[in-house]
């Protein structure tokens, strides 16, 4: 179940109230002179933001090349030739689409027969631009949950500013209208799940004390149609220190079940089976992921697990009968066993089969498993070309063995394939266009050696015949956290804004990520966080050693946790880089748990309010470690006022502190919309991508 709430929290769906970005009021008596910037919407803070934006725009936006490059990037984002990735609900394929005519987007659907045509006809379900115009709101679509099996009634999530907080409104597809007097939630970080057409599970801001310290719902309730939210029956009430609580119902015919998830922190949770008169704990390790499909329970522990007289390693995937497990049986079939080179990236059910997505030294391959009483039948599925990625993008687990695959690489535009297990090889349905001349470039994989001897993989995209003279403008990208893997994939925006200019693009698969499973991630947790930074620095040094670039021509970029990575590159390894772009970052690790959703990440970084943990956290807190009189490279911070996940204040304070120290190559830009993605539509995304590219190219060429 972790995959669900991790997607919601790290993605953009589960959603404090809109005013809760600076969740803890700063203590004005503190020694920090920039706490006033934590008052997100204050006149003083916004005046500072406007001044900074004007300075940055004058330097990097008002240039001879900016408009043309921005328009070129926007052309990629708005292209009608992009693949409209489908989401199957019943007989229809649904898609959310943004383009030049619909900057906020349209939610639409079509049939499989129509979708297979080069230019399918779409039936628009909801036009977000038209809705916003009619209501005088700048709505940003955040998804919809539709009630099985008819998929006619949906709970649509709409953000007023692109942040995680959303309004939830019941929508009727046949009439193309919101349901008068239907289910509706005000803007908040909420989770909702259909039980039946007249009942929901709901977690939201029910009033003071109803949210966790991490700013997510603390209470799960059962809400009946026609009754006020205040009358909803409490199912479970978590602790303020829990990360979030949610209840949900699965509607697979013959296997209807109700579950309660109590997430303790990012990597520990408890899941319960709910019945009419009790809740029963599913007795798996609290750090394990689990999922249920029909009669099957799948378990993936994050640490070694000894049970039933057998021991299983971290990252293994185990299968058991759900009813048997709940009855006390501990008989498992091992579906995936990791080794030093492999990890399980994900898995997806069809009606009768399980598809495994396996990473082998960060290169993907698929396997199809068929359940049986003993060992499951296992067959390989056609894999991706070399140095590419193949992934499952959609299945129909309740009704058929249909599956959809996306095949892509750094120089290979995506191909969308559809297949049915047992009916031969998947066939190409859609192909994305090429947005730059890939024939000029080549992709290679390399391994750097980190300080402790660990081999760290990285991908390099560079011009063919590139001179190894150290003079090539090079952009090194990284993340290194939350077990997120950075895999090969085509980006027309990177191609046009960086590669086409002659730049080299590098992606580092550092520890903290998920490229080698839980062990790779846990190697950089808490006190070991500096290993991620050592890995990134090792890749930078290896690029210089191989003659790809030199510090004066090497730039680094990362966002969110990757923004923290960038902050530490600035303070720990300034001599390695010629420029840094730090996006929507964490930087003040002393106060991060009191800002926005920061308390939810203590399992990743530690709790700075505990002296014994602050002792190691302070070693990687850039805001505290930036010093006067150092030779720091030029840096661009960018963020969004509406970011209610990390918030804009850490970037603000870091920029203000550095400027006060006398650094004159510190640049800051804050978009008002967009949430943690710093952009609410394609036009804003194109602007931010171009701003980053113009900054880097001006410093590194």
Model-derived segments and spans:
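Structured core elements
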Residues: 193, 201, 258-259, 272-273, ...
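Conserved beta-strand segments of alpha/beta enzyme cores
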Residues: 124, 234, 425, 504, ...
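Cap/lid segment of the alpha/beta-hydrolase catalytic domain
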Residues: 126-150, 157-165, 174-182, 384, ...
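Glycine-rich His-Gly loop
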Residues: 98, 408, 477-481, 560, ...
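Bacterial N-terminal signal peptides that target proteins for export
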Residues: 1-6
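Active-site-proximal cap/loop segments of hydrolase catalytic domains
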Residues: 494, 501, 507-701
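Beta-propeller folds
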Residues: 7-13, 18-402, 406-423, 438, ...
């Amino acid at each position: 179940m972790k995959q669900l709430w991790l997607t919601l929290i790290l993605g953009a769906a589960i959603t404090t109230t809109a005013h809760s970005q600076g969740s803890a009021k700063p203590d004005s008596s503190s020694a920090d002179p920039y706490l006033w910037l934590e008052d997100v919407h204050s006149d003083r803070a916004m005046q500072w933001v406007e001044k900074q934006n004007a300075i940055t725009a004058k330097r990097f936006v008002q240039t001879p090349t900016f408009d043309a490059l921005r328009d070129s990037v926007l052309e990629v984002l708005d292209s009608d030739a992009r693949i409209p990735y489908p989401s199957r609900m019943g007989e229809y394929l649904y898609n959310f689409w943004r383009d030049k005519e619909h900057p906020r987007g349209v939610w639409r659907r079509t049939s499989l027969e129509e979708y297979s045509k080069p230019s399918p006809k779409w039936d628009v379900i909801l036009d977000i631009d038209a809705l916003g115009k009619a209501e005088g709101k700048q709505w940003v679509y955040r998804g919809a949950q539709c009630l099985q099996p008819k998929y006619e009634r949906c709970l649509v999530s709409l953000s007023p500013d692109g942040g995680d907080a959303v309004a939830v409104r019941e929508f009727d597809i046949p009439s193309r209208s919101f349901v008068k007097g239907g289910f509706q939630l005000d803007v908040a970080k909420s989770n909702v799940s259909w039980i039946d057409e007249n009942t929901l599970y709901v977690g939201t801001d029910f009033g003071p004390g109803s949210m966790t310290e991490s700013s997510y719902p603390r209470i799960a309730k059962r809400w009946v149609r026609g009754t006020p939210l205040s009358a909803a029956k409490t199912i479970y009430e978590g602790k303020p220190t829990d990360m979030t609580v949610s209840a949900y119902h699965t509607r697979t015919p013959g296997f209807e079940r109700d579950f309660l998830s109590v997430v303790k922190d990012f990597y520990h949770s408890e899941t319960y089976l709910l019945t009419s008169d009790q809740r029963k704990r599913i007795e798996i390790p609290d750090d394990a992921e689990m999922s249920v499909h029909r009669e099957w329970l799948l378990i993936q522990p994050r640490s070694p697990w000894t049970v039933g007289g057998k021991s299983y390693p971290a990252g293994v995937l185990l299968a058991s009968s759900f009813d048997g497990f709940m009855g006390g049986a501990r008989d498992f079939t091992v579906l995936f066993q990791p080794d030093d080179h492999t990890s399980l990236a994900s898995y997806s059910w069809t009606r009768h089969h399980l598809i495994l997505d396996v990473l082998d030294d960060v290169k993907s391959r698929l396997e199809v498993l068929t359940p049986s009483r003993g060992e499951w039948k296992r067959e390989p599925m056609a894999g991706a070309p070399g140095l590419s990625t193949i992934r499952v993008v959609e299945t129909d687990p309740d009704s058929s063995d249909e599956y959809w695959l996306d095949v892509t690489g750094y120089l290979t535009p995506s191909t969308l394939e559809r297949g049915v297990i047992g009916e031969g090889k998947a066939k190409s349905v859609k192909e994305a266009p090429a947005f730059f001349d890939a024939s000029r470039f080549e992709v290679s994989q390399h391994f750097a050696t980190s300080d402790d001897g660990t081999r760290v993989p990285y991908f390099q995209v560079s011009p063919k015949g590139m001179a190894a003279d150290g003079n090539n403008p090079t952009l090194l990208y990284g993340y290194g956290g939350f077990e997120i893997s950075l895999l090969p994939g085509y980006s027309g925006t990177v191609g046009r804004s960086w590669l086409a200019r002659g730049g080299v693009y590098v992606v580092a698969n550092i520890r903290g990520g998920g490229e080698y499973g839980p062990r790779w991630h846990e190697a950089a947790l808490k006190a070991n966080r500096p290993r991620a930074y050592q890995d990134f620095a090792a890749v930078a040094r290896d690029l210089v050693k191989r003659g790809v670039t030199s510090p004066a021509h090497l730039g680094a970029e990362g966002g969110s946790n990757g923004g923290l990575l960038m902050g530490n590159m600035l303070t720990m390894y300034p001599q390695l880089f010629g420029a840094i772009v730090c996006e929507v970052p964490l930087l003040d690790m002393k106060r991060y748990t009191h800002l926005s959703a920061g308390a939810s990440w203590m399992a990743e970084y530690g709790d700075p309010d505990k002296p014994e943990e602050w002792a190691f956290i302070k070693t990687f807190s850039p805001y505290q470690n930036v010093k006067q009189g150092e030779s720091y490279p030029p840096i661009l911070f960018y963020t969004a006022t509406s970011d209610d996940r990390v918030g804009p204040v850490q970037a603000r304070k870091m920029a203000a502190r550095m400027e006060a120290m006398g650094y004159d190559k510190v640049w800051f830009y804050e978009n008002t919309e967009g949430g943690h993605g710093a952009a609410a539509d394609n036009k804003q995304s194109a602007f931010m991508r171009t701003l980053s590219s113009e900054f880097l190219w001006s410093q590194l060429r």
